[in-house]
Amino acid sequence: MNITLILFLIGILGFVLNRKNIILMLISIEIMLLAITFLILVSSLNMDDIIGQTYAIYIIVVAGAESAIGLAILVAFYRLINSPVKNPRSNYSGDPAPPSGGRGPYLHFNLLPVVSSCNLIQSRNYSSVLHRKIPTHTSCVWAGLNPSFITGFSDAEGSFVVTILKNPRYKIGWNVQARFQIKLNEKDRALLLLIQNYFDNIGYISKINDRSTVEFRVSDITSLNNIIIPHFEKYQLITNKYGDLVIFKQIVSLMLENKHTTLEGLKEILEHRASLNWGLSKTLKESFPSIIPVKRVKIENNILSNLSSLPLLPGGGNWVAGFSSGEANFFITMSGTKVWLRFSIAQDSRDILLLKSLVKFFNCGYIAQYKNRKVCEFIVTKINDIIIYIIPFFDQYKIEGSKYNDYVKFKEAAILIKNKEHLTEKGLNKIIELKNSLPPPASLEGGMNKNI
């Protein structure tokens, strides 16, 4: 009886003193149950009732088994939540294409949104990355995104931003912040989580909001210098965003030297900021009228912009898949019973060299230039080109994100047209259904000049 009482008291004390540790609390409860079971057994053994003794033994066997299983589960769970997450990039060793006609090891998150090997945490992560450098290994052998895909997607949707705002709390009256960001529709949150995971979970993913937007942002200066910039130096940008990266890197270097904390250093940063994106704001121009912008690197000086380089570029297929996941459009248009398909990528006219390179890359299509807008567009409309070149490419190098569903419907319509099923009522109705489920074509106002 004394042993039973001691066990019971130990269980109670353990429960009370360890309320913040669920593991120890549950162990304490198991000890109390063991004490009660032992009490029943001792009491029944002092009786001549064979039924009571049998019942007591039964209770001990069941309770013991339950306790053992419960503790085993708890220990396994405890080890799981405390085990380190393997860096998903640690197995990269090259940038090969996935197997022809197949998905290969790359994750198709539209079909499998939960990535067991990724630490997908929708919160800020400001862990120190002072000594972390971007790995040199690059072959995607885990359920993640190819490095060249990430660069292509960043060429489409990423931004290198430097904000300079008045703030009296700072010594010089101005606050400087540099950041890399990708902003998308909420439906592409899963894709941003994969991108964040590739970058060692630095930065943060914004919470769900009423604007239906989601943003991946990295503003920690050390993370930018040690992880973001080295990635884009190894897997280079191809659009005019390459020029933004060059200036952005220079500004980050100045900030690492604490130049942003002095007025002279701020002016030096402003000279670079004036050539980044859309230049200086009206407030900055009025406050610093003597700023002379540094010369922006010309994209023609980037060897990747050569018209013949894209097909030869290592990882070029993955870059195009990433870029298309951000910028491509898959359209179905109809007039009565006539059906047309259109695959297109529109860009600022500054990137016309890139679009001309896509014509060579896909071996089809043409470039459209618009008179009233500084926009040019790579367009493929011939059904044979779509069947022979476009669909096989995207079957091998997958579109990621919500745009994948557009591609699947586009492909289904193309197959129906190829097989002449659009000439039947059933086939035409199916194409109408597919068309109505796709986003409407964007209107590019103004006249068009067609260049082959």
Curated annotation (Swiss-Prot):
Subcellular localization: Mitochondrion membrane
Organism listed in the record: Neurospora crassa (strain ATCC 24698 / 74-OR23-1A / CBS 708.71 / DSM 1257 / FGSC 987)
Protein name, per record: Probable intron-encoded endonuclease 2
GO molecular function: endonuclease activity; oxidoreductase activity, acting on NAD(P)H
Main location: mitochondrion
Entry keywords, A to Z: Endonuclease, Hydrolase, Intron homing, Membrane, Mitochondrion, Nuclease, Transmembrane, Transmembrane helix
EC number of this enzyme: 3.1.-.-
InterPro entries from the UniProt entry: Homing_endonucl, LAGLIDADG_dom, LAGLIDADG_Endonuclease, NADH_UbQ_OxRdtase_chain4L/K, NUOK/Mnh_C1-like
Pfam family of the protein (one): Oxidored_q2
Membrane topology: Multi-pass membrane protein
Membrane-traversing stretches: 1-21, 22-42, 57-77
Function of the protein: Mitochondrial DNA endonuclease involved in intron homing.
Enzymatic class: hydrolase
GO biological process, alphabetically ordered: ATP synthesis coupled electron transport; intron homing
GO cellular component, as recorded: mitochondrial membrane; respiratory chain complex I
Family: In the N-terminal section; belongs to the complex I subunit 4L family. In the C-terminal section; belongs to the LAGLIDADG endonuclease family.
Location of region: ndh-4L intron 1 encoded: 81-452
Miscellaneous: Encoded from partially processed ndh-4L mRNA that terminates with the in-frame coding sequence of the first intron.
Residue numbers spanned by region ndh-4L exon 1 encoded: 1-80
